[in-house]
């Protein structure tokens, strides 16, 4: 039942399969960068989750180092990424994962000679 004057809360994300070829592709900035939105919404337990995959051209970064309240997981699928978290720099390759806690300065860039492909999972309380 909806109470007059109150917005109805959005429905929780349903269980679903996501086929890679069906994901919408969006150009991201200039050059070869692009991203694929996978999902964005609230889970049944109340957490907001957003997942996207990005392709980044050799030598490029998606944006300057920054901070934000939400937390992120970054999973490298292809290429070599240089990840900086709180001033600590490491190179990560396929299968590697980085976790960025709330309000910690971070950034990443493709330091390889070919494209890098990675997935970002954003977690909001």
Please annotate each region the language model reported.
Residues 2-48:
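A short, N-terminal "cap"/entry segment at the start of jelly-roll beta-barrel domains
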Residues 88-103:
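Short acidic-glycine-tyrosine-enriched beta hairpin
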Residues 102-125:
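Ligand-binding loop in jelly-roll beta-barrel domains
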Residues 50-68, 102:
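Conserved short histidine dyad/triad with adjacent acidic residue
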Residues 42-49, 69, 84, 104, ...:
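Mature, secreted membrane-active peptide modules
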Residues 69-81, 86:
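Glycine- and acidic-residue-biased ligand/ion/polar-headgroup-sensing regions
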Residues 51-55, 73, 97-99, 120:
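Conserved hydrophobic/aromatic beta-strand scaffold that supports enzyme active sites
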């Amino acid at each position: 039942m909806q109470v007059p004057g109150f917005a109805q809360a959005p429905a929780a994300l349903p269980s679903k399969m996501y086929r890679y070829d069906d994901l919408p592709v969006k150009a991201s900035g200039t050059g070869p960068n692009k991203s694929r939105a996978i999902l964005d919404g609230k889970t049944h337990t109340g957490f907001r989750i957003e997942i996207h995959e990005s392709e980044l051209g050799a030598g490029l970064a998606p944006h300057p180092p920054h901070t934000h309240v939400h937390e992120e997981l970054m999973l490298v699928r292809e290429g070599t990424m240089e990840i900086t978290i709180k001033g600590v720099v490491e190179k990560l390759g396929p299968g590697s994962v980085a976790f960025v806690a709330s309000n910690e300065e971070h950034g990443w860039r493709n330091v390889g000679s070919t494209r890098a492909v990675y997935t970002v999972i954003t977690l909001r309380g």
